Amino acid sequence: MKTSAQQAIRDIQHFGEEGGVVPVIDVASTSTFMDPRDMERTFMGELQGCYLYSRHSNPTVNIFGQKVAAMEGAEAALGVASGMAAIACAVEQIFRNEGGSGGHIVTSRTVYGGTYALFKNIFPTRGLSVSFVEATDLKAIEAAIRPETKVLYAETLSNPLLAVSDIRAMAALCKKHKLKLVIDNTFAPMMVRPLELGADVVVHSCTKYISGASDFIAGAIAGTKEFIGSLIDVNTGVVMLTGPVMDPRVAHELYMRMDHLGVRMKAHSQTSLFLAKNMAKEKLPVIYPGLETHAQHGLLKTMIDEAIGYGGILTLECADAEQARVLATKLQDEKFGLYAVSLGFSRTLMSCSAKSTSSEIPESERKEIGLAEGLLRFSIGYTGDDQVMWERFMKCYRSVVR
């Protein structure tokens, strides 16, 4: 029987001191060697498994990594300081491992705005060129591949347009052209396991669903033991040498919260589907991958754990940015949600993507990819009564959109 992400997380078990049911937090920045020669061998890469310095490795961060690895079906995982650190370090490490002399990346035109800015404005200064293509068009992806291409980067569900990546097909392309497939699974933890579908590396912004409380900035990278080990190599590891490490206190808190991540994701999904179905009945311009009317609903259905559902993100297109602002203000006043970026919080968060998390993408390109100025992205929470929240939503919507 295949082990679900929920069961895999459940089976990670660490005891605290004196048999405590909660593991201790190890906040030491440096560790003692009983034999000076062991320190020397560690620095030379001859001795593995020793704690040296917390920029290299930390026991509490490591046990959090074990839970992320269990969730993703990975050999190993590493917690880092943020989701952007996870993306940057994972991609740069691949190029370092492949020779480190520059190269080329193919990615989606509809990625998160911060990712777009990193790829467009920072990576080229480091010798990495990037082609942005339509991620749902496999022919366009293959046409963009060059001899120097090393990475295909995509999101399980694109942010904010909710296009679904065909990870199996992408993996086949990567195998054919000897590329590494990196998938940002931030929108779909517990729902989708990209590594099982053929991806090589998975990254997360743990700030979102894994935290669930909008109180930490954190990220994670999952993959093979060899790849995760390369990230913290004392001589060539991008995480080790650039330093975006996870605080052990954050790692401990996230380790504990992952036990109920599955319960939370189910609740996000259930409420989102309820609201999306009601919006669809009212013929509102809603996009949610759990609706059968979504262009790639069938594809996503072949990838998800249906016990978890289709996630907690939906979008609604308003006439323009001003109408979106007015609607969001009314919704906040009526306590439907909070006008704030990010996602994965227990309460609903709303933002106008073109004016916030996708503002890094030039307006001309936003028009080309269909990201309307009035698009409202909702990260649906699970607190309160669904029917009451729906009634509040429609009261506000009808007062704005007549």
Predicted segments, located by residue:
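Conserved small-domain helix->loop->beta segment predominantly found in fold-type I
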Residues: 273-347, 361-367
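Short, well-ordered beta-strand elements within core beta-sheets of diverse protein domains
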Residues: 254-263, 311-319, 377-381
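N-terminal "arm"/small-domain region of PLP-dependent enzymes with the aminotransferase-like
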Residues: 1-58, 66, 376-379
